[in-house]
C-alpha cells in the first residue's frame, strides 16, 4: 500500500515473514506444504456447504470456526498437525499485502460485476453516504471511545488508527442470506455496495493514520490532496481499464475462455496499477472496473458465454472466500495463543467484548445520524431496513489483513510490539464476534421483523404454480408412463416420490381463485406487472442471443425495463416511455442543417438512427407479445391478467404506428433488418445442428471442428459486415422519415444540398 508521501508501508517480505514463523527447515517443512492447507480448506469448505445447507448458520461462520480450531491445534498444543501444520504456518506468514492482492480483486470484481446497474445508480447516493461520512463518523466514534476508556495509554492517532481499521465491513454472510430469503434487491445492493465502497475508504483512512502514527507529520493541505488523489485517481484508473477491456472484448468473437481471461486479467492489472504504481486505492479501482463491466459489457457475453462467465466468477469468489475465512480463523487463533500480553495482562478479553459493543454502537450512530438523508435518497429506507442495515456491519478479511500489517510493522519507537499484538487480537476478535453473533442471528432478526414472510399475492402464485406442476407431472406421466419395452409405471408410487405435489393430489382447485376477488388490489397488480416486465426482459436476452438485436439496442431495452420496474406501484406499464426518445430524433439533430456537415455523413446519421429505432420498436413489440402469451398461459383469463395485458397492448400502439410509417416510406429499411436477423438465425441454427450431430455420434471431433469454424467465420463476417441499406436520395430520406416531426427545416437542408 502507498502512503500519503508516496512511500510504501514497511511490510515484511514474504520470505522474511515466513522465516520469522516458528517453523523451520529442521521440521522437514517444504513450501509445497502450503498446497495441503489450500486443498484441505476447500475439502472442508465443500463438506460444510453440504452439511449446513438450509440451516441458519452462515457458511463463512462455520469456516471461521474451523480455521480457529485448526489454528488452536497447531499453535496451542504440543502435538502439531504435521504437513498440514507446516502449510498453516506458511499461509499465516504470508505478507498481508500479498493476501489482499491475491484475493481482493476476485472478491471485489465478482461482487461489483454481479450487481444490478440500475439498482446501483438508484442507491449510489445512499452508498456514498454510508461509505464516506459513515466511515468517518465510525472512525472518530470508535477512536474516541477507545482513547477514553481503554487502559493502553494510546494517543489519539493510534486510537483513530484502530477505529479506521475497523471501518471496513464484509457482509458476505448477510448478503448471501438476504438473497437466499428473497429480500428486496435494493436492500442487498445497498449493503453489498456500501461494503465495496467503504472497504476502499477505510483503507485510505487507515493509510492516513498509519503514516501519522509512524511519525510523518501532515498538514491539512497534504491530507486533502491525498484523499482527493486516492478517490479520483482510483475512479480514473478503473474507468481506463474498463474502457480498454470492453474495447478488447469487441474483437473477441465466441471465445468464452478468452473473454473470461480478459475480465480476470483486467481486475488484477487494475488493482496492481492503482495500488503499487499509482499509489491510489486498488479497492475502489476494481470496484469501478466491475461496475463499468456490469454497465457496458454485460450484453457482450451471450448464451453459454454469459452463463460460463458468471459460473467462473461464482466459483472463483467461492474459493477465495473459503481460503480467506479459513485463514482468518487460523490468524485469530495464533494471535490469541501466541501473545503473552493478551493471555496474561490487561484484561484484554473484557475489553474485546467492550469493543464489540462499541462497534455496534458506532454502527447505530452512523445509521441514525444519516437516516434522514438515507430516507430521502435512492429508494428510501424504512425503519425495518435500517435495523438490518445496522446489524449487517460485519468485519472480515480486509480489517484482519490491515491488523496483520500493523503487527508486522510494530516493534519500533512509534509502534510497540504490544500494541501490534493487541491490534491483531482485538481485530480478530471483532471479526469473529460480528460473524458469529451478527451473521448467525440475521435470519432470526428478519423473522422477528417479518421481513422473511411471503405476501398474499406470492403465496397464491406458489399455490397456483404447484397446481400447474401437478398438471405438468400428469402430462409427463402420460408420455412416459407406458414403455414399449418395460411396460407401465405405478402412478401412486411416482407421486409419493414427488413431495412438493403431495398436498395437491385430489384437490379440485381453480388456479385463478383469489385473483378475481382481489383483482383491483394494487399490490396484486404491482406483483403481476413486475412478473410481466421480468418476462419482457427475458425475451430481450433471448433476442440478443438469437441475433435479433445488437448489444447497444439490448442495453437500451434493458434499461427501459429497469426504469419501468421502479414505477409499477404508481402507474401502469411504462417501459415504452423510456424508449420513446430513442425512436424520435433528438434536438441536436438540428445541427444537420449546417452546410458544413458533408452530405454522406448526414445521410449515414439519419439512416443509422432510423435503423436503431426500427430495432427498438420491433424488439419491444415482440417481447411484449411473448410476455403477454406467457402471462395468459400462466393466469388464464383472470381480471388481473387482462388488466396488465391491456396496458401492454396500449403501450404498443405507438411502436406499431411507427413501423407502419417506415413500411410505407422506406420498406427497404425493414427488409434489410429482417435479412440480418434471418441470416443470423440460420447460422445459429446450423451451429446447433452440427452440435446435435456430434451429440448423437454421427460426426467426429475433427469434422465438427471444421464445420464449426466455417459457421463461426460466417457469423463473424455477418457481425462486422452486415447487409447494408442502399442509401436513398437525401431529399426523400429526410422529407419522408417518420422520425422527423418538423420536416420543413430538413427539407430545406435536403434541397440546398441537392442544388449544390
From Swiss-Prot:
Task: Provide the topology term for how it sits in the membrane.
Answer: Multi-pass membrane protein
- The protein's organism comes out as Arabidopsis thaliana
Q: Which GO terms describe its biological process?
A: lithium ion export across the plasma membrane; potassium ion transport
Residue spans crossing the bilayer = 32-52, 57-77, 90-110, 126-146, 158-178, 195-215, 226-248, 252-271, 277-297, 312-332, 351-371, 386-406, 423-443
Gene behind this protein:
NHX8
Cell compartments where the protein resides: Cell membrane
Q: Which residues lie on this side of the membrane: Extracellular?
A: 1-31, 78-89, 147-157, 216-225, 272-276, 333-350, 407-422
Role summary: May act in low affinity electroneutral exchange of protons for cations such as Na(+) or K(+) across membranes. May also exchange Li(+) and Cs(+) with a lower affinity.
The name of this protein is Sodium/hydrogen exchanger 8
Q: Which GO terms describe its cellular component?
A: plasma membrane
